[in-house]
């Protein structure tokens, strides 16, 4: 099957959010407790799963971490059968929450990384799609994942790489002192080597849960569940005739290749079912302004949007997606950029008493997010704070070169958003 996806779960956040993603897929596909097909299970599960010799399905995923703690945590759960420790990259190292140390740990173990990846890839019919769960905050999730996506791009240049990344709290306290350094380097690497990024912010999800009074007690587990669940809803589209690339292409079709950051509206999980579904574009826009997960949609403009609903899958709508991809720049600005656009392409899991509208959005309101990342970075860098510890064995001059080039790349992204906004 040409739609097979290899998933990478990198670092603590990648492991835990990815684990919730797999748990959601297992429930949605009605796999039995031994991970064999249930009575009503779909037959095309090899998009995300591979069938073992014992005729049960296991996730096509590789876990990369420089500590055993979080992997041991999921191996004690009821879903431990999903993972085989011998297939994963688990070391006992300490990155000290440094992107540089995580990145160079990948280089130091390049032969082991190559061996693990190639063994999994050899079992696939084609190597086209990679899905990466990570954080841009810490050393492993940011640094090691940057090495991995660079490795994939260099060795599988025609592949499509999507990252599901957790962004840090940019306005509050953080437990990671080096977070601004890590974020700048990680975003730059994703821009250079990835095709798309679906991003989340923990504090934004926590605020949304509190606002909707879902539960008085918040925890990382609940936030990870929300992230894993929403990604499974989006990716469930791939059980139809869509590939990872054709799903996301409508969101990233614009004259600037590095404007590929999208977010998710998770109204499907949080709001009670409305008596009347919005039918007009204006109503949908107003609704999105109220419940978007990460961005203030009133402060910017849509580049593109995909709607996923509980209505039956309409193949007819696929044509409008493919048409968008071939817009030249002039038609893009005149016909796509200046209007809100939504395409129905999937049937979500029905959940009683809950709304069934989910949106994947590419919006210019992401611009203030990366501007804040640069602002936090400059506050730290102008004092060269903690650089000696952060760099470790890496030469300071080399680190400063990486910082300068990464910052310049992100400033280009900011400039491109500003250029697009000038057309409104």
Curated annotation (Swiss-Prot):
<dbReference type="Pfam" id="PF00091">
    <property type="entry name" value="Tubulin"/>
</dbReference>
<dbReference type="GO" id="GO:0007017">
    <property type="term" value="P:microtubule-based process"/>
</dbReference>
<dbReference type="InterPro" id="IPR000217">
    <property type="entry name" value="Tubulin"/>
</dbReference>
<comment type="function">
    <text>Tubulin is the major constituent of microtubules. The gamma chain is found at microtubule organizing centers (MTOC) such as the spindle poles or the centrosome, suggesting that it is involved in the minus-end nucleation of microtubule assembly.</text>
</comment>
<dbReference type="InterPro" id="IPR036525">
    <property type="entry name" value="Tubulin/FtsZ_GTPase_sf"/>
</dbReference>
<keyword id="KW-0547">Nucleotide-binding</keyword>
<keyword id="KW-0493">Microtubule</keyword>
<dbReference type="GO" id="GO:0005874">
    <property type="term" value="C:microtubule"/>
</dbReference>
<keyword id="KW-0342">GTP-binding</keyword>
<protein>
    <recommendedName>
        <fullName>Tubulin gamma chain, nucleomorph</fullName>
    </recommendedName>
</protein>
<feature type="binding site">
    <location>
        <begin position="137"/>
        <end position="143"/>
    </location>
    <ligand>
        <name>GTP</name>
    </ligand>
</feature>
<dbReference type="InterPro" id="IPR003008">
    <property type="entry name" value="Tubulin_FtsZ_GTPase"/>
</dbReference>
<dbReference type="GO" id="GO:0005525">
    <property type="term" value="F:GTP binding"/>
</dbReference>
<comment type="similarity">
    <text>Belongs to the tubulin family.</text>
</comment>
<dbReference type="InterPro" id="IPR008280">
    <property type="entry name" value="Tub_FtsZ_C"/>
</dbReference>
<dbReference type="InterPro" id="IPR023123">
    <property type="entry name" value="Tubulin_C"/>
</dbReference>
């Amino acid at each position: 099957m040409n739609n097979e996806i290899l998933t990478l779960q990198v670092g603590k956040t990648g492991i835990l959010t990815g684990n919730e993603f797999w748990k959601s897929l297992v429930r949605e596909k009605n796999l039995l407790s031994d991970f064999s097909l249930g009575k009503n299970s779909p037959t095309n599960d090899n998009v995300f799963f591979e069938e073992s010799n014992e005729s049960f399905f296991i996730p096509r995923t590789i876990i990369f971490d420089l500590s055993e703690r979080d992997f041991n945590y999921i191996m004690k759960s009821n879903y431990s059968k999903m993972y085989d420790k011998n297939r994963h990259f688990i070391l006992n190292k300490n990155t000290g929450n440094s992107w540089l140390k995580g990145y160079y740990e990948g280089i130091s173990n390049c032969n082991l990384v190559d061996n693990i990846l190639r063994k999994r890839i050899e079992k696939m019919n084609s190597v086209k799609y990679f899905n990466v769960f990570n954080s841009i905050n810490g050393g492993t999730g940011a640094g090691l994942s940057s090495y991995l996506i660079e490795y994939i791009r260099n060795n599988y240049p025609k592949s499509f790489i999507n990252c599901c990344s957790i962004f840090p709290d940019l306005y509050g306290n953080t437990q990671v002192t080096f977070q601004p350094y890590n974020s700048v380097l990680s975003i730059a690497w994703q821009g250079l080597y990835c095709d798309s990024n679906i991003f989340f912010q923990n504090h934004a999800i926590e605020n949304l849960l509190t606002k909707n009074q879902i539960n008085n007690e918040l925890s990382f587990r609940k936030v990870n569940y929300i992230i894993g669940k929403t990604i499974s809803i989006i990716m469930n589209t791939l059980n139809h005739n869509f590939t990872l690339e054709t799903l996301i292409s409508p969101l990233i079709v614009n004259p600037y290749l590095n404007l590929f950051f999208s977010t998710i509206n998770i109204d499907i999980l949080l709001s009670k079912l409305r008596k009347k579904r919005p039918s007009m574009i204006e109503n949908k826009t107003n609704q999105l302004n109220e419940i978007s997960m990460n961005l203030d949609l009133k402060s910017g403009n849509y580049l593109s949007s995909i709607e996923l609903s509980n209505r039956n899958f309409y193949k007819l709508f696929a044509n409008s997606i493919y048409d968008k991809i071939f817009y030249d720049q002039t038609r893009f600005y005149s016909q796509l950029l200046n209007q809100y656009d939504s395409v129905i392409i999937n049937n979500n899991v029905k959940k009683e008493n809950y709304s069934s509208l989910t949106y994947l959005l590419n919006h210019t309101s992401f611009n203030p997010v990366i501007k804040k990342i640069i602002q936090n970075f400059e506050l730290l860098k102008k004092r060269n704070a903690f650089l000696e510890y952060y760099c470790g064995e890496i030469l300071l001059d080399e680190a400063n070169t990486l910082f300068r080039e990464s910052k310049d790349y992100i400033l280009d992204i900011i400039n491109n958003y500003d250029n697009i906004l000038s057309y409104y």
